[in-house]
């Protein structure tokens, strides 16, 4: 069996896959954000991860004697200068567990974990380059992925899609993180937000300003939510089409949004490969699969 550990900005995750690739365990705990706040300080995230990890490991303790290798997300993406303190919680814990179990430790990154989780659970086994759309609270990137590398070919030049969603949600009185509740409450609307795409790069700050204006003018929040999701989906459609003709794998929590899924499915048909929303949000399943493949 192979153990994956991931400590992202808002979720503590551990997962185990078997020798044959079956998901044996998938445990997660969301970090707590105070009411009215739009996020956590990294130091607070580290503190909460260090409290959560022993609890999650306790839940999978019966499998620990069978673990052959451990893998952990050591940084946000596979770049030399990629760094966030929250991942130190996972790496520190993984080092200790590796030593105590006397098994090898593999270091990977959060982004590749997302891609692997989505690809495996969607049964997407590409034979050539494809585009992964990474949509989360801290990231909006288009990645050209092959068997060796994931190259950023487009991104937001200001705020990520998830941050746009959470800012608008908190403005409208929702608890952070807001994406799931906004998805559930989104109502039909005639309101539109500006779409700003140059090549495969996107700007969302103009959409945020217009959403604030709509809210102050009395447009119902539920309609603004739909306008936000439409803006994100339309921006992604344009950015991907500008990148070329590829199969597409959406990953990250924002990708699970209903409006975005429907829009991209209509735009790209069989070329877009959505997995179950459970494997789009932050998890350690992909890290466990990476562990299995690299062992």
List where the protein language model places each region.
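Short glycine-rich, Thr/Ser-proximal phosphate-binding strand/loop in the N-terminal lobe
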Residues: 8-47, 151-152
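Short, well-ordered amphipathic alpha-helical segments that serve as non-catalytic structural scaffolds
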Residues: 27-29, 48-63, 235-239
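A contiguous, well-structured pocket-lining segment that forms one wall/lid of small-molecule binding clefts
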Residues: 184-248, 254-272, 292-295
């Amino acid at each position: 069996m192979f153990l994956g550990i991931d400590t992202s900005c808002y979720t503590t995750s551990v997962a185990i896959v078997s020798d044959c690739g079956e998901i044996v365990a998938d445990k997660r705990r969301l970090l707590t954000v105070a009411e009215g706040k739009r996020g956590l300080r990294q130091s607070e995230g580290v503190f909460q991860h260090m409290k959560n990890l022993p609890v999650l490991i306790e839940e999978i303790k019966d499998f620990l004697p069978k673990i052959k290798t451990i893998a952990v997300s050591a940084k946000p993406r596979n770049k030399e200068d990629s760094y966030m303190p929250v991942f130190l919680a996972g790496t520190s814990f993984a080092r200790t567990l590796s030593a105590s179990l006397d098994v090898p430790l593999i270091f990977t990154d959060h982004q590749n974990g997302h891609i692997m989780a989505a690809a495996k659970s969607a049964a997407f086994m590409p034979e050539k380059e494809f585009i992964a759309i990474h949509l989360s609270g801290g990231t909006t990137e288009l990645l050209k992925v092959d068997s060796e590398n994931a190259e950023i070919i487009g991104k937001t030049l200001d705020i990520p899609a998830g941050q746009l969603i959470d800012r608008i949600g908190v403005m409208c009185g929702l608890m952070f993180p807001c994406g799931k509740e906004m998805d559930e409450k989104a109502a039909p609307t005639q309101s539109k937000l500006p779409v700003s795409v140059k090549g495969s790069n996107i700007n969302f700050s103009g959409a945020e300003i217009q959403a604030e204006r709509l809210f102050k003018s009395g447009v119902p929040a539920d309609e603004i939510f739909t306008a936000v999701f439409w803006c994100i989906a339309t921006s992604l459609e344009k950015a991907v089409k500008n990148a070329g003709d590829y199969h597409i794998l959406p990953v990250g929590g924002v990708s699970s949004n209903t409006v975005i899924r429907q829009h991209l499915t209509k735009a790209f048909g069989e070329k877009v490969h959505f997995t179950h929303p459970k494997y789009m949000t932050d998890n350690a399943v992909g890290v466990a699969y990476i562990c299995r493949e690299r062992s």
